[in-house]
Each structure stands twice: as structure tokens, then as C-alpha cells.
Amino acid sequence: MALADKRLENLQIYKVLQCVRNKDKKQIEKLTKLGYPELINYTEPINGLSALHLASVSNDIDMVSFLLDLGAHPDVQDRMGCTPTMRAAELGHELSMEILAKAKADMTIVDNEGKGVLFYCILPTKRHYRCALIALEHGADVNNSTYEGKPIFLRACEDAHDVKDVCLTFLEKGANPNAINSSTGRTALMEASREGVVEIVRGILERGGEVNAFDNDRHHAAHFAAKGGFFDILKLLFAYNGDVGLISINGNTPLHYAAMGGFADCCKYIAQRGCDLKWKNLDHKTPRAVAKEGGFKAASKEIRRAERIANKLARPGAKNPNPLWALRLHDWSVEREAFLREAFAVLDRGDGSISKNDFVMVLEERQDYASSEQLAAIAHLHEKTRGGGVNINEFFKGTRYLNKSFVLGSYGPKKKEKGMGKKGKKGKFVLPLPICVIPEYAFPRRQDGGPPYYMIETYKNVTDSSRFNRDHPPEHPIQDDSVWYIDDSEKVFSNINIITKAGDLASLKKAFESGIPVDMKDNYYKTPLMTACASGNIDVVKFLLEKGANVNATDNFLWTPLHFACHAGQQDIVELLVESGALIDAASINNSTPLNRAIESCRLDTVKYLLDIGAKFQLENRKGHSAMDVAKAYADYRIIDLIKEKLDNLPKPAENQKLKGKTPPILKTEGPEIKKEEELLSSIYGVPTTSEGKKVQKGNVVHLNSLITSGYTKKVDITFIPRRIWSPEATTAELIRKRELRRERFTHEVDFDDFMMPFQKNITEKARALEAALKT
């Protein structure tokens, strides 16, 4: 239709488009009657959109019907050549598309690139699939190609994994199975093989698709199937006379690609079906070298086994027991099993077998891979006695005329037969230890139905970033008026221990002020103080101690914060906890003390500090190991010498006394005992209770009467309370200084992704040293 090119025409068409958006039918009707003739079919000058385009895009079926009744043409095109039907199909608006189809919209129109309406239906939704069905029912060309030479069926096969139903529908409607992209040489079969959709590959081959076509790079469909490791597609291609040994321009065979991906079954299959095992690509690498380079032992093993078989057959006078025609016949018969069983059923003698002549006749009529003499030889191998006939089930197994390792039944996981083979030795019984977590139902929920209390709201300053930031904060609360024109972001809740590890003191402070206990445990029994000690954040530790955190709280393994601090090797945090009342000989679930954790981290300063303040190094854990035994196990001679010195300086005990420390009793860090009848789930799992104060209803009569009697109504309150107050943030200079202190504390390695805390670093170094020693 005509583009509006005059000022009055422009104004009128824009007015019509605006009325379509506003659904103003009266004004549209008035403009079409009194405006330019055929105004309803005019398009605006920029994008070429008409009124029907807008209605179709918005899926306003009422407006689409109204415009069609006013005389709107369903085939008007925009500047891209797209009709309203194409725009509706692109967005999956099936209702609008159905109305346009009933209005006899032309489904064969193409846009400026040669794309028909079906190109706009290639998206992985049910609505787009229904749009494609509508287009096909009303005459869309299923063999439409773009001006660059890409057919619609090939375009659908490029996304076959997502639009499988669309591809199968195109095939049923008569799409060319040999659709080819003239610019690249790719066929629909190659694209379907690359996507790994067996149903589409089978549909193409059954409809006469060319199986041995190759693209401009001499890539065959088998190359793409092998690259993706699609074993079932490789079977299909070979069964339909596909060549799995074709060499591409870069010198790679399908076996090279299967070896690159480490697909052992694919490597075995391709090697058995005639691919050259010794062929080298342009990098001068054989398939086995490629598999070995990638570290795929199973694939390399299969190729090596095939090479040994090939070397035996290369000897003079050797006969191949698995000829290529027999392999192809076997794969084809398995693929067409249902079809062949129907043909055999007519000639069945009643015992599941047919005569030799009938067997040869049925197969000779339906395949070209084996001659009548070869089929007769196969039938003879199946006859147990003269005239005994061919057992149909035995034929489909293929083991009568092929080796067991070459039939399709040898692939895939092997089933173990009951009662066969020797019984292996019973391994050491290992008690399965699940991850111990507090169940969600044990946590009390918020009154408003929000998440559990260990999930706290993250705090952040919401302000106009063009006016204020961390380096230029507002001077006073009234100056920051951005709350009046910036919307509040939605509440975001995070695990209290994740926030603790990140050092977000503002969020923690807000949570504690709202009634969240400072010793709140998450679903892994950890309190914020434990997490802060484990991550080595001394600022958060100080903050939590100021808030009254329990320094002797325990998790499910009875670790205290001091255990975590010693395990992390944080000397200053250890001193801070001890000064705050932490028990230096607190026993964990296996009777290990903080001293044992410090020894495991190989931190000499922490071990020396604990020994100096009186930590008992004679105590033994459940395995009977003392501090000296642990030090010897971790092989730090500095700590061994230190403990040995302490042992030498001990006063000698009396002869009738044994030098064996008593394990301190396990501390109860929870509240007072509760009667079993009144015991809650939260107390069973050690979850602290959260108290939410009752909010006084401002409309309550009692509350209002108390205000009146107290003279509150006579007071003039001029207090201004800002809606939001800027929370102090660290400046850029402070953040840089904080990073410098962090580097001084944890060394420069803290800035790298592979940073490890002392214990993990110690274990890793020991393991690497042991591995290096074993290699030498």
C-alpha cells in the first residue's frame, strides 16, 4: 500500500495509529470516512506500519476484526516487507493470525529478504507452532527459500532440538527432504544431525533424503553426528547406506570428531563400520592420537582395539568375518524391524521361523545391500538342521553371521546376569553420613509470611546517584529528597551468614534492631560469629561481640567460634575471643580442642598463644590422639618442637598417678531447660526464638483515649521525620585502605580466585609435595 508522503496524509495516518493504540473506534471510523480515501491502508513514513500492523502486534483481536470490517487490507506490507500476518506470527499471536487467515490473507507473500510467514514461526513455543499450523492450512509454501538460498525447512532444522514438532509437520506437509543452503552447501539432514534429533533424521531419510551429500567444507552428516556424540543418528545414517568414512577439507573423518569429544561408543561404531583408522588430519594426527591428547582413555582404548583387529585382517589370506555389507544389512534390519516383522509374519510357519527361500525373497525385494547369494549364505548360517528354516528373532540379533562385538546389542550398558561370576570381596562398610541441616519447618516464620528469620533483609542506600554517592554524601537528611521521586526497590533477603561473610554491617545492624537474635543459626547450625571467625573478618567479630554474641555457642559438631578462629589461623581473633570469655579447652563432637585446630592449620603463633594461656595439650580426642600426635600427623617441626618443649617442662607425676587429662564436659550453651510437653521444634534444633513486638493500632479506641487524657492532642508537634536517612558508607579511600589491610592480613594472594585459608593451603601443599615425591 501507499506510504504517506504529504504532511496532511502523515498527520492523518499518525492520528489513526494513535487511535488504534487507544482503541478509539469512533474516531477511527470518523477518520476513514472523512479523511483521505483508503486511509486505513496507508502506512506511516518511517517504519511503514499500518493500522492493521499495530492491532496485530498488540494481539487486539477486537480491533483487528474492526479494521478488517472497515476495509483494511490484510496483505499491506511495511518497509521490511512484512505483512500483519508475519508480525502476528513472529510474536505468536495465534488469535490475530487466525482472524487474518479467515480474511484471506495471502500466506505466500515474502518480505524484502524473501522470507515467507513460516520463517516467523520458527520459535520454541506452542503458540508459534499453532501459528505455523494456521499458515500451512491456508496455503503457506513449505518449500519457501530466502533470496540467499536458505529453505524454510533447513532453517527449522537449524533449531530442530527446540522446534521438533514444526520440523516434523513440515515434512508431513511435503517439505523437500533434500533442502540445501546454496551458500554453504548444508542440507537439512546435516542440520538435524548436528542438533541430534533422531525423529527428524529418520523422517528425512525415509522420504528419500540424500544421505551422502556434503557441504562446501566436505562435511558429511556423519561428521556432525559424531561431533555431538549422537550414536543413534550414526546408526541411522549407516543403515541408510551412509558413508561414515568421508574425509573433510581439514582432513578430519567422523572418527576424528568422535575422538575429540571422547565418545567411546561412537568411536567403536565408526571404527567397525569402515572408517580409516590410520588417516591423519592436517595436524598430522590420527583419531587415536586425538583421543589420547584429549585425555579420553575409553575412546582411545576402543580405537586401539579396532586397530589391532584391522592389523590382523591385513595379513595375507585373512578373511573378514564382518564384511561391510553384512554390517549394513544388520543395522538396516534393526532399524526396519517392525516393517520386516510384518512381512515375515505372513510367511511364518507357526514356530517363529520362515523357510530359507522365503527369507531370501523378502529381503531381496526390500534392500540393495546384499545379493541373493549373500542372503542365502546368511540363511544357511541360521538353519540348525536341513530345512529347519530361519528363526526371525535370531536374525534380528545378528550373532549368527556377525561377531558379538559388532552387533548393535553389544553397545550400551551391559546387564549383569544373576549367579554368574565370582563374588567380589566385600568392601569396608561405610555408614552414609548425610549433610546435617535444620529442616525448614523447624524455623519460625515471620508474621507476614516472609522467609525464615535467618534470611535477613539486605540494606542499601536508595538515592539519586547523579547527586549523591559514597564520596559525596548529603550534608543533612533534608538535603536528600530523592525519596520523593525514586521508587523503593523490592526487599531482598539473604542468608545472615552470607551477609556476615561479606562484611555488610549495615544489614546486620538493621536485622538486630528489628528483633533478630545476634546468635541466629542458619540451616547449617552456624551463627554469624562462627562465620566471621572462619572468614577472618575481625571488624565483624568486634561488632557481633559488642552486640552480645555468645562466644561459647556451638554448632552441630560442637565447634565454638574459637574452633573456627583457630582453624582459620587468625591470631588476633583468637585473642579477642579469649578476652571475651571463650573457653580455651572446649571439646567438639570428637573431643578436639581449639588447640588441635590451630595445629592443623600449622599456625605457630596461635599454638604458642594457646599454650601460654594454659591450653591443655595432654587432652586426647576420641581416636586417642593428643596434641603431639596431631602435630606429627601434620608434620610441622616447629610446632612439634614447641609441644615437646612444653612436655619436657612438665612436672613429673607421682608413680600412682597417670598422666591423662580428663575430657572437659560438653557445654550447654542454650537457654534453660524446657518441659517436653512445651518443647518446640525451634528449641530442639537450637534455633533462638525471635520476638516481634505487638504493634499498637493507631485507630484503637483505648489508645486514642489515653492520648486525649494525657494532653497529647493539645501539643503542637513540629518534628520533621525524613522518609529515608542516608546510611554512612565507606568512601573510596576507605575501601582502598580496607583492601590494603586485607592484603596485609591474608597476603597479596587474597585478591586471586584461588586464595585458600591456612588449613586448606597447608593440606594442598602437603598433597602436592607428596604427589611430586611419588612421581620421582
From Swiss-Prot:
| Record keywords | ANK repeat, Repeat
Cited Gene3D superfamilies: Ankyrin repeat-containing domain, EF-hand
Per the record, the coiled-coil ranges are: none
Q: Name one GO molecular function term.
A: calcium ion binding
The family database entries (Pfam families) matched by this protein are listed as: Ank_2 (PF12796)
Q: Where are the ANK repeats?
A: 47-76, 184-213, 217-246, 250-279, 524-553, 557-586, 590-619, 623-652
Using the record's annotation, list all stretches that form the EF-hand domain: 335-369
* Effect after changing K694N: In a breast cancer sample; somatic mutation
Question: What protein is this chain from?
Answer: Ankyrin repeat and EF-hand domain-containing protein 1
Task: Specify the species.
Answer: Homo sapiens
What is the taxonomic lineage of the source species?
A: Eukaryota, Metazoa, Chordata, Craniata, Vertebrata
